[in-house]
Each structure stands twice: as structure tokens, then as C-alpha cells.
Amino acid sequence: MNIPLSDKQIQQLLRYLSLIQKWNRVYNLSAIRDPIESVKKHLLDSLSIIHFVQPGLLLDVGSGAGLPGIVIAIMKPEIKVFVLDSVGKKCRFMQAVKSELALENLIVVNSRVESFKPKKLFSQITSRAFAEASKTIQLTKHLLEENGRYLLMKGSNIEEEDVDNFNMKVHSMTVPFVSDKRSLLEIQL
């Protein structure tokens, strides 16, 4: 992956994983309970897209436990990252992470994506396990600025995605210690 990490980022990422484990017992944030699997399937998976993230406002839709949004906020403190989810308990968790890790660049939004009306539009929108690409675009295009782009994290079944009408690049992602195929759909409207 070749991603340089500062000591502070390492500590923040480890603390974040520990908070996921702690809160997951009560709030059911993720089906993944094993800490090692959490590192592989949450942390490393989210880190795999970090080189594709560019400067500008970023929105992570259907953020759930904050993946990949919180990881991006940790790795790119110069970028303002909005994490959006409609489930209150997940937003309370993300707010606790923001506070605990002192992530000044993270904004937690408890809203349905269709109802969200930001003051400024986003230059990039990410999602992981939210909806198929065409549905994600349909629900969020009112939030994307002109020439903005999507970074949609997907598995191997990208041929099932209905994205024929979009300017799209498909990146095959290699996530260390994860045998499942991963893809990143980079879509510009």
C-alpha cells in the first residue's frame, strides 16, 4: 500500500479500531467482531483508497461506523470530511470518535442523504457498502459540485453496477491480507 503514517496517525487509527470494538458490543456497528478481521476488512480496506482522495470537501455517504470517512479524516487532516448516516446511534458513535481523536476536520451529519442540504457542494463523494453505483449517484448528485467525482468502494461484482452512462475508471484494489477482490469506481459527472 505504501502509505506513510505518522506516530499520531497510527495512534488515532488504533484508538479508532478500539472504539469500534467497544461500541460494537452495544450498538452493532459492524458484523465484524474479530479485531484482526477489523484491521483487515475495515482499516486496510479504507486505507486502500487514500491515494485517490484529492483536496476539497469530501462527503462519505452511508458512513455507518465511519468507514472510510473517519480513516480519510485521520489520514488527510487538511481535508474537511463530512460523514453522513441516517441512523442516530451510528452518528453518536462517529461524534464520540471525533471528540476522542480530536478530529477538527470531521463533521458528523445525522440525516437521510435525500434530505441533506449542505451550505457548499462537495468535490468528492465516497461510499462503501451503501448502494449500487447508479442508485448512489441518483441519491447524491444534488450534493456534488460541477466536475466533482465519486469514489465508490465495491467488491468484485462491478459488472452488476449499472454505470454505462458515466465517465468511469475502474481501479482493481489490492488490500493486504484480504483475499476478496476489491474495486474502486472513480466516476466523474
Where are the predicted features?
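Class I SAM-dependent transferase core
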Residues: 1-55, 59, 89-92, 96-106
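A general structural signal for well-ordered alpha-helical segments in protein cores
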Residues: 13, 43-46, 69, 122, ...
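Conserved beta-strand/loop positions that form the S-adenosyl-L-methionine
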Residues: 61-63
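Conserved SAM-binding loop of SAM-dependent methyltransferases across substrates and taxa
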Residues: 65-78
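S-adenosylmethionine
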Residues: 79-82, 86-189
